[in-house]
Structure formats: structure tokens, C-alpha cells
Amino acid sequence: MADVAPAGVEKSLDDFFAKRDKKKKKEKGKGKEQVTGAAAAAAMPVKKMKKEKEKSTKSENQDAQMEKEDEEWKEFEQKEVDYTGLRLQAMQMSDEKEEEEYEKEEVGEDGEIILVTSDKMSGPWNKSGGAPPSAASAPVEEVEVPEPKAPGVYRPPGARLTTTKKAPAQGPPEIFSDAQFPSLLSTARHVETRKDREMEKTFEVVKHKSRVREGEGPGSMQQLQLDNQYAILGDK
């Protein structure tokens, strides 16, 4: 009986530990299911957020492209610059001419002061059809100003007497002139001129191909002895 009791105790212990392990496994399974369910629930809004972000980025890109296309057709608007520090004013172009009149005091012949109104815009660049100047204005005296003399430059006596002569105006070149445009055929149709005659006095003009040298004329031909001078020696 003593041996049987410990065996029953061991079985009861094994059953106890087996039940405890089953409980632990069940608790672990429930915990995993809860974790997976929570993870899935957390993942759903993340996916929705990603989709919403993608949609928003696409819409922003489309809006940016539309704005760029609109900017190409926008008219240029000049920005107003503050010139107060530089003491300058912005120029404003207007179609109508704004002429401001001012009064000018002039002294007449009798010493009376005359007020003359004139336009600021008038001048040599903007002539307006106004009245001619009044005759009451005093005549302006012309003062002769002596012309300044050029500084003295030394010139040699020969250069002082020489005067610059204008060369005669040359006309167009004569194309058919042999003197200006000589050719090979000019000797065949050569016409004697006064200049050629003067040249003949100092130079000999060759006009023929065959030229007789000096000392080779017909009068200077030597008489040659053509007979045999040694014939006398043969008779002996």
C-alpha cells in the first residue's frame, strides 16, 4: 500500500501540471488574438491615412500645374519702388501734355518791370506755335570775340613757299588704250606718235625679227680664197 500511494500522488501532480499548461496555452492564444486584432485595427487607419495623403499630393500637384499655366498668361505688373530715400520720384507717363506756366520778370527800356509768362515745356525740342517775341525786349549787342591764334609751328623756308596744288581729277580709265592696258598685239598695230619719235633719238626700236649686227653687212663681207694653196707642192 505504501508503494501505491506515491503513484497516485504522481498522477495527480501530472494532471495538475497538465491542466495548468492548458490554461496557459489558452491564455496565450487569447492574448495573441487580441494583439492581432488590435494591430489590424491600428493598421486600418494607417492605410486610410496613406491613401488620403496620396490623394492630397496628387491634387496639390494638379493645382501647381494649373497655377504655372495661369502664370504664363498673367500680365506683367510693375512693382512700385520707394524712391524717397534717393529723393527721386517714380515717372508716370500720361497721354496729355501737362504744361506748367511760370512768370519771369524782365526789365523794359523805361526801367519798368514786365512779367512775362512762358511754358516750362517749351524749348528747342518742343516748339509750340506761340506768339513772336515782343519788340519791347532790348536788342542784344553782338560782341566780337577775337579768334584764338594757332600756336606757332616752325616750318623750313622751302615748306613756307610751297603751296598745295590740287591734282587734276582723273577720269575713268580708258580700257581700249594700249598705254594703260598694253597687250601682245600692240606691236602689230603700233602707230608712231611724237613720244615714239623722241624715243627713237636715244633708243633703237626693234620692229623686225631679223636684225643685222654691226660689221656683218654686205659691204663688210671678206673675200675668201677657195683654191687649194698646197697644189704647188704636189707638182714638185
UniProtKB/Swiss-Prot annotation:
The modification N-acetylalanine is found at A2. It is found in: Cytoplasm. Keywords: Acetylation, Cytoplasm. InterPro entries: CDV3 (IPR026806). It comes from the Eukaryota. Residues 51-67 have a biased composition (Basic and acidic residues). Residues 20-29 have a biased composition (Basic residues). GO terms for cellular component: cytoplasm. Pfam families: CDV3 (PF15359). Residues 1-75, 92-111, 120-181, 209-236 are annotated as: Disordered. Its main location: cytoplasm. Residues 96-111 have a biased composition (Acidic residues). Residues 34-46, 127-140 have a biased composition (Low complexity). Belongs to the CDV3 family. This is Protein CDV3 homolog. The gene is cdv3.
